[in-house]
Each structure stands twice: as structure tokens, then as C-alpha cells.
Curated annotation (Swiss-Prot):
It is an enzyme of class 2 (transferase). Its EC number is 2.7.7.-, 2.7.7.108. Belongs to the SELO family. This is Protein nucleotidyltransferase YdiU. GO terms for molecular function: AMPylase activity; ATP binding; magnesium ion binding. Its cofactor is Mg(2+); Mn(2+). It comes from the Bacteria. The active site is at residue 256. Nucleotidyltransferase involved in the post-translational modification of proteins. It can catalyze the addition of adenosine monophosphate (AMP) or uridine monophosphate (UMP) to a protein, resulting in modifications known as AMPylation and UMPylation. It comes from Brevibacillus brevis (strain 47 / JCM 6285 / NBRC 100599). ATP binds at residues 94, 96-97, 117, 129-130, 180, 187, 266. The gene is ydiU.
Length: 491
């Protein structure tokens, strides 16, 4: 007896261009089936933008596809090979619990990877069970969608499906599979793998494929590999600046977690900073603070140096010349990052033009925030709403002096008060996914099966710059008993 097809086609439109790469870059396999897949949450807006039918995605057959029990028409599931530096140590990696179904071509002609995360063991599993727990998959769903709402390039979450099976970590937990959507899953670690374990022809094939996929405007240029390095550096400089501007801490900036596309990828022990402190670390495994908030720009350039090393054979046949070329380009990161960050900080303070003293004004505020343990997001929110009395800085002599300097600075530009406030609202989120709110939503969802708390949180986070009355309750700080907050590498 054949399975009944859904009455409405789901809208899959798969291409599998990654399979045109040399076979060393992937392993083809179908995921092992799970016992009893059920849809936990579906991102309807994202589904529609991908050209998928929301009703069909909720059918038993398509849920089975999102669980790996069936292969969608046109998909060619594969696990990607890559390597990477994890906390500074090089190791062979690969998709240990994820499978790329293929690339969905949208009605507008865009191409997005569709990946199942938590789909079972692969040749790269390195002793792991290949599965994922429901809590961490829902957490990635929340944080990635919050990042999208903030306007930060990111992978997206299409759905989470429960498996009806348990996974065993410190305790027995419900299993789940996340459907992740990405511009691609090509990582710095993919290039490290090619440079270390493959031929120069394979490395060139990967670089050419990456150019075609992410930098088509330069794929025919004579110095295209140099331009590829420059392009990736530019995108990462812009991305890391955006992270810093909203207080996002990735937590595990290994080279395999840096996407060539310039999207934020792999939401493991990430979190948003409450109290401003450049030394903030949330990850339980980052005991040295390697990936602390203030270190993120430095780690980015370290990772990009590993990318540049991988490209050396393509930059020049003479190794010394290739190294010189790479070093010259890498030296641009600091300037690019700083320019992006300074532009963003000016916007957060309502500054439409540039003055030389702006950086001192910005640093003055940040130093006060650190000294008085002020909340990063809420301080900028209070300034945006012209409610300085709402900050813990209010009443201190240094803040009074700073506030006067800032007000005087605002008068030296043509924009009126209204324009300044509107500009600040576009750059200072009223809400972020605060750690205690995320935990509250996850507890209700995976422990009690109540997704209403999570859905409310997602609605608020989908438009963080709206400054609506509904958002106010989500601006409250965690109780002292909830600090210090720690995150774990559950994803």
C-alpha cells in the first residue's frame, strides 16, 4: 500500500549544486528514521518566502520529511565535510548530526540550503549519537529568529519536529530535529579541510563554487581569489560590528562556526549581554574567556587569518608572495570593523553627521556603563525615549556631564528632536531575547508542552524596534538570583 500524497503540494523546488563539488567534500546518505515525528513549531512567514505551502507543511507526510523519515522529491541528502580550530586547536570535523537535504530555489530565484539538524549519525559523528534535544533546538529557533528581527545576517529556523524518542545527555531528554535555512553552510572550516586534506584542484573547485554562489559579481575576475578573501573579510567586519552593537555574544567562534556567506551560524552557547562588560562570557566551556564579548572582533580576524592561509595556493604560486598578499588584506579588517562599529554607535546616539570627538563621547558612555553595571540595551532605550532617569547612571556627576555634552552635540546637526528620536528607535532595540525570558519560554515548551509563552516571545522579538506597550514587560532585567547566567553547548 502506497502512502497518500498530501492534497496540496508542499512546494519543494530542490537543486543540489553542492554535489557538483569533488566527492571528498561530502558523504551521501539518508537519515535513520525516528519513531513518532510531530510538528512542534513552524515558521509560517519564512515558509511562504521560500515558496512553501504552510498547510502542506503541517501534513503527516511533510512532517515525516522534516524528521528525515522520507526524502522530499528532488532532495539528495548529504553530510558536509569540514575541519576547524575549536578553541584554537585544529581538528577534523564535519556534519556529525546534520544533513543537507538540498537547496530550495525560491519563487524569486534565491537559493537557500535546507538542513536537518539532529537527524542522526553520519560518517563525521566522532562517537556522538547524531541526535539533538528539544530544548536546544527551540533555543536556536528563538535566537536565530530574534537575530533576523534585529536585522543581523543569520541562518533561519523553518521548523522544529519532535521525534518521539529520547536523547541522553546529563539526563533523559525529548529528541527533536531543527530545519535550518541558510544562504549556504560553507564555512572557514570547509576551506581549512580542502587546504589540509584535498588537492589544490579540489581547493580551487571549492573557491570557484563559493564565488559562483556568494560573489557572482567577481567570479570571472582575474584576481577573483584575492577578491573572495576581501569580500569575506568585508562581510565579517560588518557582521561582527552588528553583533557588538546589540550586545550579542556568540560563545563558540570556532572557525567551523564562521560562515563564508557572512551569516551568523551555529547558535550553541550564545546569549545577549545584560550588564555592559566587555569581559562577559556565558558559555560554561569557555573558562579562559577566549570568546568574550570584547574579544569577538579579535577572534574574527584570527579566524579570517586561517581562511587566508587556506587560500594561499590560489593567491600566488610563490608562497612568500601569497603570504604578503594575504597579510595586506587581513590588515584591512580592523579599519573595516571599526568603521562599521563607529557608524552604528553614532546611529545609536542619534548622530547623523560626523565629528572627531564622537568616539570619545561613545567611549565615555560605555565606560560609565561598565563602572556602574548598567544594562546595555536599556541604557540606549532610555536615551532613545528621552528618559535618562530610567538608567542607573542617572544622578551621577559624570553622567550629568556626559548627558550635557551629548545634548550639545545633537544641536550641532540640522536634524530636529523628532528626527533624532526616530533615528535612534531604528538602531536601539526596545527588546532583545533576554536569557531569563528565553529560559522561561523553553521551560514551558519542552517540559509542559505549552508553546504560548514561546510564541508570544517570538512575536515581540520579530519587531524589536517597534517600541510598543506589549514590549515593556520584556525589558525587565533578570532577578539577581538568575545571575550569573550560563549557557551550554546543547545545539
Amino acid at each position: 500500500m502506497t502512502d497518500k500524497k498530501p492534497t496540496i503540494e508542499p512546494g519543494w523546488n530542490f537543486d543540489n549544486s553542492y554535489t557538483t563539488l569533488p566527492k571528498s567534500f561530502f558523504s551521501r546518505l539518508n537519515p535513520p528514521p525516528v519513531r513518532s515525528p510531530k510538528l512542534a513549531i513552524l515558521n509560517e512567514r519564512l515558509a511562504k518566502s521560500l515558496g512553501l505551502n504552510v498547510e502542506a507543511l503541517q501534513s503527516e507526510e511533510v512532517i515525516a520529511m522534516l524528521a528525515g523519515n522520507k526524502t522530499p522529491e528532488g532532495a539528495m541528502p548529504l553530510a558536509q565535510a569540514y575541519a576547524g580550530h575549536q578553541f584554537g586547536h585544529f581538528t577534523m570535523l564535519g556534519d556529525g548530526r546534520a544533513l543537507l537535504l538540498g537547496e530550495q530555489i525560491t519563487p524569486t530565484g534565491e537559493r537557500f540550503d535546507i538542513q536537518l539538524k539532529g537527524s542522526g549519525r553520519t560518517p563525521y559523528s566522532r562517537g556522538g549519537d547524531g541526535r539533538a534535544a528539544l530544548g536546544p533546538m527551540l533555543r536556536e529557533y528563538i535566537i536565530s529568529e530574534a537575530m533576523h528581527g534585529l536585522g543581523i545576517p543569520t541562518t533561519r529556523s523553518l521548523a522544529v519536529v519532535t521525534t518521539g524518542e529520547s536523547v541522553y545527555r546529563e539526563s533523559e531528554l525529548p529528541g527533536a530535529i531543527l530545519t535550518r535555512v541558510a544562504a549556504s553552510h560553507i564555512r572557514v572550516g570547509t576551506f581549512q579541510f580542502a587546504a589540509r586534506f584535498c588537492s589544490i584542484e579540489d581547493l580551487r573547485a571549492l573557491a570557484d563554487y563559493t564565488l559562483q554562489r556568494h560573489f557572482p559579481e567577481i567570479e570571472t575576475e582575474e584576481n577573483r581569489y584575492l577578491l573572495l578573501l576581501k569580500g569575506v573579510i568585508q562581510r565579517q567586519a560588518a557582521l561582527i560590528a552588528k553583533w557588538q552593537l546589540v550586545g550579542f555574544i556568540h560563545g563558540v567562534m570556532n572557525t567551523d562556526n564562521m560562515a563564508i556567506s557572512g551569516e551568523t551560524i551555529d547558535y550553541g552557547p550564545c546569549a545577549f549581554m545584560d550588564t555592559y562588560d566587555p569581559a562577559t562570557v556565558f558559555s560554561s566551556i569557555d573558562v579562559q574567556g577566549r570568546y568574550a564579548y570584547g574579544n569577538q572582533p579579535y577572534i574574527a580576524v584570527w579566524n579570517l587569518s586561517r581562511f587566508a592561509e587556506s587560500l594561499l595556493p590560489l593567491l600566488h604560486e610563490n608562497e612568500a608572495q601569497a603570504v604578503k598578499i594575504a597579510e595586506d588584506v587581513l590588515a584591512e579588517f580592523s579599519k573595516l570593523y571599526h568603521s562599521n562599529w563607529l557608524t552604528g554607535m553614532r546611529a545609536k546616539l542619534g548622530l547623523f553627521n560626523e565629528e572627531e570627538q564622537d568616539e570619545a563621547l561613545i567611549e565615555g558612555l560605555l565606560n560609565m556603563m561598565k563602572e556602574h553595571r548598567a544594562d546595555y540595551t536599556n541604557t540606549f532605550r532610555a536615551l532613545t525615549l528621552n528618559q535618562p532617569e530610567e538608567t542607573v547612571l542617572f544622578g551621577t556627576s559624570e553622567f550629568t556631564e556626559w548627558h550635557e555634552q551629548w545634548k550639545a552635540r545633537l544641536t550641532r546637526q540640522p536634524e530636529d528632536t523628532d528626527a533624532v528620536q526616530q533615528g535612534m528607535k531604528k538602531n536601539n532595540p526596545a527588546v532583545i531575547p533576554r536569557n531569563h525570558r528565553v529560559e522561561e519560554a523553553l521551560e514551558a515548551a519542552w517540559k509542559e508542552g505549552d508553546y504560548t509563552v514561546m510564541e508570544r516571545l517570538l512575536t515581540v522579538l520579530s519587531d524589536p524596534y517597534a517600541y510598543t506597550p506589549e514590549q515593556v514587560e520584556y525589558t525587565t532585567l533578570p532577578a539577581e538570583s538568575a545571575r550569573p547566567y550560563q549557557t551550554f553547548c546543547g545545539t
